[in-house]
């Protein structure tokens, strides 16, 4: 009787290509040294990426690490819940609820235009006083372990869509912050408020930003947006928002930096805090990565 390890290595690799990554990494890699070495072979992860459509042969973009590329692609999705108002205001924290409060309406809405993606059916709309809502994304809870984020620091792509009513002016604002485990702000994107004049074309506009080469230690992402109308009309005449997204890209930092020393006093979401209060990074990279890979 032939033992499985007596099979040619190319046959074993072919078998591994068809095994789901969580089982491959959590279980198969621990069987023996031969399996561990084969599972770490670059060609295995390149072929798995091709097989699952993460990469095509005619794609010219270079890949630094095929194993990490595959893992990031398998995790990739919108980390914001209920981005298109399909569940009313569920999953959103209401930070400001001025005027007649937040409301959900169906596209295109009064004095509005259709959305570029016809799969999007609804939007959130603000009123005559400030309306703000937010979500705090816990990266560890979403499958992005500390070792993955700190060692490779994949790009974080943030997008939002906003539109005014044609008959009323309004202002829109967006704030995105990358924070540590104890909510120290490590990087932020907060562009100046956008003002739309009355009698505009009411077209939907995309606001986007990519965080690259940010400091290690990112554990949370705060996403907050909203606004109000500029004419103080009763009802819902402020900016409309929908299809918001936070996506962790497969693109990673080329030269991960050493651990960063925080300044004496640092910005914390909602307050200020001494650097000595922050937690230290823990964990062995590969063990943590294998154990935390999403099913």
UniProtKB/Swiss-Prot annotation:
Record InterPro entries: F-box-assoc_dom (IPR007397), F-box-like_dom_sf (IPR036047), F-box_dom (IPR001810), F-box_only (IPR039752), Galactose-bd-like_sf (IPR008979)
Keyword flag Kinase: no
Keyword vocabulary terms for this entry: Cytoplasm, DNA damage, DNA repair, Phosphoprotein, Ubl conjugation pathway, Unfolded protein response
One Gene Ontology CC term in the entry: SCF ubiquitin ligase complex
Residue span(s) of domain F-box: 1-48
Phosphoserine, modified sites: 249, 276
Pathway this chain belongs to: Protein modification; protein ubiquitination
A single GO BP: SCF-dependent proteasomal ubiquitin-dependent protein catabolic process
Pfam name, any one: FBA
Localisation per UniProt entry: Cytoplasm
Entry keyword Transferase: no
Residues with PTM Phosphothreonine: 280
Primary localisation category: cytoplasm
Residues annotated as transmembrane: none
Stretches assigned to the FBA domain: 69-250
Gene Ontology terms for molecular function: carbohydrate binding
Tissue: Present in liver and kidney (at protein level). Widely expressed.
Function: Substrate-recognition component of some SCF (SKP1-CUL1-F-box protein)-type E3 ubiquitin ligase complexes. Involved in DNA damage response by specifically recognizing activated CHEK1 (phosphorylated on 'Ser-345'), promoting its ubiquitination and degradation. Ubiquitination of CHEK1 is required to ensure that activated CHEK1 does not accumulate as cells progress through S phase, or when replication forks encounter transient impediments during normal DNA replication.
Quaternary structure note: Interacts with CHEK1 and CUL1. Part of a SCF (SKP1-cullin-F-box) protein ligase complex. Interacts with VCP.
Protein name: F-box only protein 6
Species of provenance: Mus musculus
